[in-house]
Amino acid sequence: MKIFLFGVMTFLIVINTLGCSKNEAYNSQEAIKRGDIVYQNEVVNLERLKQFLINLSNKKEDTIRITGYTIEGDPIFHDLQFDGKVIQYTYDNSNDHFAGDDKGTEKDVCKEVVKKENEHGEAEFLLSGCSKGNSLFLLRVEKEKLKKQWSN
């Protein structure tokens, strides 16, 4: 009887863990509802990025998720968790059905988010000062859209 109960409990724990996975795939409408900064054809919830940047400059803890989608609709997650000192970054393309050998998660620790203008006049947001030595691209926004949304 004990073995049976142990088996049932183990099964329930595994099912619960899999069902509540933080990185479970969800569509862009659900991502918007959850408060993710979503980029697909356009960037949605951009004001959340602005608040995160304000919190960074004030050394206030904050967490955001930036979710992009492949052409096929598979989510790519960028999780940024600021502890008041550094940004813990996780890149997760484990739901990308066409990721090939690069499929999975990668982690890094970075110092800041920088905004740069690219050759097309768009604002690009990147993580810099990362422990692995390279800057990490987060998202790209048309400068006019950024100015319009952030002027409010």
In which residue ranges do the predicted regions lie?
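Sec-dependent N-terminal signal peptides
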Residues: 8-12
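C-terminal motif of bacterial Sec signal peptides marking the signal peptidase cleavage site
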Residues: 16-19
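N-terminal export/targeting and maturation segments
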Residues: 21-79, 84-88
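Extracytoplasmic electrostatic interaction patches
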Residues: 71-152
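Positively charged n-region of N-terminal signal peptides that target proteins for export
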Residues: 1-5
